[in-house]
């Protein structure tokens, strides 16, 4: 069921070129709204048919303009790193933070 406030927030972000980040099954909401058409996107396996018009890959994270999507809990660190990259405007900034956490994680 559509939530009016969520819809308003998504509209605001799209109208003002603000970041939208969705993980697990949440990217399907963006797909159903037609916001992923022509954009790279990923989601939890099995929900891909809801990413209408998206360029779907098997990557852990996909970033396209102001929209960042990720597969699920197991990709949360890479998802967070992509968000940091977007917010800082500096590719690799998020990876540096994750690596400094001393977590043995391999980025794709």
Which residues are covered by each model-predicted region?
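Active-site-adjacent pocket-lining segments in enzyme domains
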Residues: 1-108
